[in-house]
Amino acid sequence: GVPINVKCTGSPQCLKPCKDAGMRFGKCINGKCHCTPK
């Protein structure tokens, strides 16, 4: 995944930030969102 500068405690929190970044969905890894490119 592509790390973005968004803090998280759970993967659902990364859905919108990843979408806003033009990517698909994300996982929360080490407290930061990692997104999947389209």
UniProtKB/Swiss-Prot annotation:
Its main location: secreted. Expressed by the venom gland. It is found in: Secreted. SUPFAM superfamilies: Scorpion toxin-like. InterPro entries: Scorpion_toxin-like_sf (IPR036574), Scorpion_toxinS_K_inh (IPR001947). It comes from the Eukaryota. Disulfide bonds join 8-28, 14-33, 18-35. The keyword Disulfide bond applies. GO terms for cellular component: extracellular region. The keyword Disulfide bond applies. Has the structural arrangement of an alpha-helix connected to antiparallel beta-sheets by disulfide bonds (CS-alpha/beta). Negative results: does not block Kv2.1/KCNB1 (Ki >2000 nM). Potent inhibitor of the Shaker potassium channel (Ki=0.16 nM) and its mammalian homologs (Kv1.3/KCNA3 (Ki=1.7 nM), Kv1.1/KCNA1 (Ki=136 nM), Kv1.6/KCNA6 (Ki=149 nM)). Belongs to the short scorpion toxin superfamily. Potassium channel inhibitor family. Alpha-KTx 03 subfamily. This is Potassium channel toxin alpha-KTx 3.4. It comes from Leiurus hebraeus.
